[in-house]
Each structure stands twice: as structure tokens, then as C-alpha cells.
Regions:
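General structural signal for secondary-structure boundaries
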Residues: 1-6, 72-75, 116-117, 200-205, ...
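Short Lys/Arg-enriched helix C-cap and helix-to-coil transition segments
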Residues: 273-277
């Protein structure tokens, strides 16, 4: 590897010519994180204010394969909150900042370490949404006699539950999540072992984990949905699902908002307010969601 590559000067020189560049990150020695950069030798993450013309490129230089990712600040923020890119936290933790014109990446890394700017609440909400959805799908699969599908979905549900437990402890989930869980939450780790290695039938194993997930969905609901409950509580007249979907705090997050609202309402954490909606049709009522504490006007 040349000195230019090792020092990052090669990449700095190339990308500094691109208009609107905010920050530049190089992951030069991926080691165990190589699978997170699609088997390439280097990852260059270039952050822009405006959407770039080319988002993903593969380069080769001196036998070194380079994955180039161009993202906007907004895309990066959404990915971090919604965990769309599981390797992103590791990239930021292990990468070298080559350019950072306004200190954005350094501030972002600090935010990750301190869980600032509602990051913890947003990640908990996203993980809980997926936790509840996959658990319910597994439960339905079991009713339909689709045992292997039920197994697949409850395994995914366990992963989201594990992520919730880690985030609650102030830890970022890694790809080796079960190594983390062995120390952080032996109970969830034991369920994972029961599901994957127990000698009982697949159906019996799935039933066992579904019962545990069902209890956890109800006990984790309020604390995991703090962000959503707080936003809804800012209006006495309530919110439509469309208004919530486009709220700046929620827009772009990977959420099954309809499922969350219904579960929260049935549990009594929210109220449904049915109001006539003449634009839709006579007799049609539009549902709005308000805090369970406030009274409707």
C-alpha cells in the first residue's frame, strides 16, 4: 500500500475537488468489518449537503479495491436513527476523518458516543416497531401452520429485542450482537439458544419464544415509544397518521406507524378521536390520535 493511500492524501486530493463536500471518511483497515464494505479493501464515505450525481462507485487503484459512497447529511442522519446500515456506527468508530469542513463528522461521532439529540429515542422506536411487527408475523405464521416462516420471523424478532436491550444500556448493536448479549442480557441470550439449539420440535421452540416476546412487547412498549408519545402529546386535538408520518422527527424512519398507533391505543397510552371527514364521504370518520391524559376538544 502506497504512502499516499496510507495517509489518505490520495483520497483527499480527489474528493476536495467535488463541489459541496462537507466531510470525508476513510475506512482503510476493515479487518473483521470487511463484510460491511461489501468485500472491498477500502471504504470512502463522502458527505455532501446536496444529493450527489453518483451515489455508489467501485474503484481500483494499485490493486486496491475501493468502495465509494456519497451521501447527504440528511441521508446519514436517517441511516443512523433507523439503523438502515448496520455497519455505519463501526465505520464512524474505526474510520479516519480526512476532511471535515465544519466539524460535522466529529460532532456526529461525539453524538454517537453520548447518544445526543434524541438518537436513543429514535433508535428505540425503530427497533421496537420491527420487534412488534416480526413477533406478530411469527404468531400469525404459527396459526397458519407455517412453522418455518414462524421460526424465521421470531428469530428476527429476537434480534430486534436484543438491539433494544443493548440500546437501553447505552450500547450500539454490532454485527456480533449475540456476543454482546451474552454479557449484557443472559436472559435474551438464553432464549436465542433455546430457539436455535434446543432438542424440542421447531414448533415448540417457536411457541416458547413467542410467549416471551409477547410479554416483552407489552412491558417495553411505553419506554420504547417515548418519542412518539411525546410528539402526540403536543396537540390536544390529536394527529392523523399522515401528519405523524411527515413530522420532521419521524419522517424517513423505518416505522410501521399504523401498527404502533393501534397497539398504543389498545394499551391505553393513546386515545383514538373519530371526527367526521366530509371530503372523504358522508358517514366516514377520520381517526386522530391524542394523548391519553388530555381531553378532546
Amino acid at each position: 500500500v502506497s504512502r499516499l493511500d496510507a495517509s489518505g492524501l490520495f483520497y483527499t486530493d480527489l474528493f476536495s475537488r467535488e463541489e459541496g463536500l462537507v466531510s470525508l471518511l476513510l475506512v482503510a483497515n476493515p479487518y473483521s468489518y470487511k463484510t460491511m464494505i461489501d468485500g472491498m479493501d477500502r471504504l470512502v464515505l463522502a458527505v455532501f449537503r446536496q444529493a450527489p450525481d453518483r451515489e455508489t462507485e467501485h474503484w481500483m487503484w494499485c490493486e486496491t479495491r475501493i468502495l465509494v459512497l456519497r451521501v447527504t447529511v440528511e441521508q446519514l442522519e436517517r441511516s443512523l436513527a433507523g439503523d438502515d446500515s448496520p455497519g455505519l456506527v463501526q465505520w464512524l468508530a474505526h474510520g479516519d476523518i480526512l476532511l471535515d469542513s465544519d466539524g460535522y463528522l466529529r460532532a456526529l461521532k461525539e453524538r454517537l458516543e453520548t447518544w445526543g439529540a434524541n438518537l436513543k429515542e429514535r433508535k428505540l422506536l425503530c427497533e421496537f416497531s420491527q420487534f412488534a411487527k416480526t413477533y406478530l408475523q411469527s404468531k400469525q405464521d404459527l396459526k397458519d401452520g407455517q412453522i418455518l416462516d414462524a421460526y424465521s420471523h421470531i428469530l428476527a424478532s429476537l434480534h430486534h429485542w436484543a438491539h433494544i436491550a443493548l440500546i437501553e444500556e447505552g450500547m450500539h448493536p454490532e454485527l456480533t450482537v449475540w456476543v454482546q448479549m451474552r454479557n449484557v442480557n443472559p436472559g435474551i441470550y438464553k432464549l436465542y439458544e433455546e430457539l436455535t439449539t434446543n432438542q424440542e420440535t421447531v414448533e415448540q421452540r417457536v411457541q416458547l419464544v413467542i410467549l416471551a416476546c409477547e410479554f416483552s412487547v407489552f412491558t417495553k412498549m411505553k419506554s420504547s415509544c417515548t418519542l412518539l408519545l411525546r410528539l402526540i402529546g403536543t396537540r390536544t386535538e390529536g394527529w392523523t397518521v399522515s401528519e405523524l408520518m411527515h413530522h420532521p422527527e419521524l419522517e424517513g424512519l423505518k416505522l410501521d406507524l399504523s401498527l404502533l398507533l393501534q397497539k398504543l391505543a389498545k394499551k391505553g397510552y393513546l386515545r383514538e378521536i373519530a371526527k367526521p371527514h366530509r371530503e372523504i364521504g358522508l358517514g366516514i370518520l377520520e381517526l386522530r390520535y391524542a394523548s391519553a391524559i388530555e381531553r378532546a376538544e
